């Protein structure tokens, strides 16, 4: 029954995100990345992961909903930690190129088959591998990521080869 109430809560979160007015503002993406990373500390430690964080010390000001984008980073980190090989490295990086900021979350673990990648962001999708490894998840975390980024009119890409998987999303730099 606890699992069912968590599922209901996740579905309500999605509904709220889809119907919510975005609070677009200028905010520091570096700060959001650090907050998401800090809130994942216990899960990362429990998996024995090393973190390699390349987050600029200077502010990277972007345009968007701070809370929703922090949720995106958190969900990506949570997924990366969940499917990383215990004791491996988890990477969180933030770079700027022109009008866009790029956030990358990368882990070492099983390679995601190419045919699975387009399905990752579908509601309730769980790969065969994640079904056996992730008993608590619902296949909603990446769907939430996609929903939030679509509201922001931003992109996310996934690469997975030789046991390294990376998710990179864009954010519009503040003017």
Which role does the model predict for each range below?
Residues 18-25, 61-64:
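Conserved micro-motifs of the catalytic ATP-binding
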Residues 112-125:
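Short conserved segment of the HATPase_c
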Residues 69-70:
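A residue-level detector for a conserved hydrophobic packing site
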Residues 25, 45, 50-60:
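Conserved catalytic submotifs in the C-terminal HATPase_c
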Residues 25-41, 52:
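A conserved beta-strand-to-alpha-helix junction within the catalytic ATP-binding
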Residues 153-154:
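Conserved glycine-rich
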Residues 80-81:
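Short helix-loop "hinge" at the ATP-lid/N-box region of the Bergerat-fold HATPase_c
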